[in-house]
């Protein structure tokens, strides 16, 4: 596995409202250009970019894990991957850990995932 300098920030959400993200993650979203979102809630998350953000966003609607992994591997700069709840408990976390080094990944489970 070749390690890259860019980070993949995996953000678990429990709401489609941008304002429900902690301020740290709102800032991360503002600063990151490339965003991957599951196809099932792509339009809701894409609407976050209408919040007077300075940086234009490039969104990727992931329809399959294979397609998503290929897209993530092609990215040269930091990316955000939106998931539901806690991505390490169930979902995409395991697949990411099989394809990327731990140093490339940062996980931010949703607040309700701690309950």
Model-derived features: positions:
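Class I S-adenosyl-L-methionine
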Residues: 1-115
């Amino acid at each position: 596995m070749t390690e890259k300098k860019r980070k993949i920030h995996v953000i678990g959400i429990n709401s489609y409202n941008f304002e429900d993200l902690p301020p740290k993650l709102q800032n991360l979203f503002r600063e990151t250009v490339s965003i991957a979102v599951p196809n099932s809630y792509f339009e809701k998350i894409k609407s976050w970019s209408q919040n007077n953000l300075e940086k234009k966003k490039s969104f990727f609607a992931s329809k399959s894990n294979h397609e998503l992994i290929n897209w993530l591997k092609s990215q040269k700069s930091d990316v955000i991957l939106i998931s539901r709840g806690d991505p390490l408990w169930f979902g995409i976390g395991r697949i990411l850990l099989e394809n990327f080094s731990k140093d490339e990944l940062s996980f931010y489970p949703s607040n309700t995932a701690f309950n």
